[in-house]
Regions:
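Mid/C-terminal beta-alpha module of Rossmann-like enzyme folds, strongest
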Residues: 188, 192-209
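NAD(P)-dependent short-chain dehydrogenase/reductase
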Residues: 108, 118-177, 182-186, 190
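Active-site segment of SDR-like NAD(P)-dependent oxidoreductases
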Residues: 8, 54-55, 92-100, 136-139
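Adenosine-cofactor binding site in Rossmann-like domains, unifying the SAM/SAH pocket
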Residues: 23-41
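Glycine-rich NAD(P)-binding loop of the Rossmann-fold in SDR/ketoreductase-type enzymes
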Residues: 64-75, 107, 111-112
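NAD(P)H-binding glycine-rich loop region in Rossmannoid oxidoreductase-like domains
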Residues: 38-68, 97-98
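Conserved Rossmann-fold NAD(P)-dependent oxidoreductase catalytic core, especially the SDR/UDP-sugar
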Residues: 74-108, 131
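N-terminal Rossmann NAD(P)H-binding glycine-rich loop of SDR-like oxidoreductase domains
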Residues: 2-19
Length: 209
């Protein structure tokens, strides 16, 4: 059995497609409390894909961010340690802020992700196997429900289909993002053979808007 948290989200749905032949236990954000109270089949779990979180970078709901992004993440990481289950966790490149030289989270979402990254670093030797991936700007199929949080690529594609043109803003050529296709993210997370650690997951090729 593979546990997939955030199974109804953009990236979670793409993991489900890739794992369609596997036995999956889906855990969505609203089910997290019930899952914590009732799930007892840890001995059947071969892998945890912890993709669930409040992902809105503009969220100011500190209570919800603390509960879902920090406390639930720490709890499921603790279960991975307790039962020695391999786990792969979705962090975020937002922990860096404007540069990659230091940690400088610019919003509460990024702070919540960095908090868990630090927790992982402190406990990394207790896991049987853990990989945390700092996703850069992921785009691809399934972004329809993300609204204003969708990638520029998704927004531009929708604009072309609806209006036949793309709306840019002044200075958009100076805004660079590392766009990475969701299928590549899924493939790398599921199939890479790197040791336990925290990794950046992007292309290393920033592109302007």
């Amino acid at each position: 059995m593979i546990i997939v948290t955030g199974s109804k989200g953009f990236i979670g749905q793409n993991f489900l497609k890739a794992l369609k032949d596997k036995e999956i236990k889906e855990v969505e954000k609203n089910d997290s409390w019930h899952f914590r109270q009732t799930f007892n089949d840890w001995n059947k779990v071969e892998l945890i894909l912890h993709q669930g979180a409040i992902s809105h970078t503009t969220s100011t709901n500190l209570k919800a961010l603390q509960h879902f992004n920090v406390e639930f993440s720490q709890w499921i990481l603790q279960q991975a340690i307790k039962y020695q289950i391999p786990i792969k966790y979705a962090s975020s490149a937002s922990v860096y802020g404007h540069t990659l030289t230091d940690m400088n989270p610019l919003n509460y979402y990024a702070i919540s992700k960095l908090t868990v990254d630090y927790w992982i670093q402190d406990h990394i030797n207790e896991f049987s196997f853990i990989q945390a991936f700092r996703y850069f700007n992921v785009y691809g199929e399934g972004e329809d429900n993300k609204g204003d949080q969708a990638s520029p690529i998704s927004k531009f594609t929708k604009q072309v289909k609806e209006d036949g043109k793309i709306k840019l803003f002044e200075g958009s050529d100076k805004f660079l993002r590392d766009f990475v296709f969701v299928d590549d993210v899924v493939d790398i997370v599921l199939n890479n053979d790197k040791p336990s650690g925290i990794y950046d997951l992007g292309t290393s090729n920033p592109t302007s808007f």
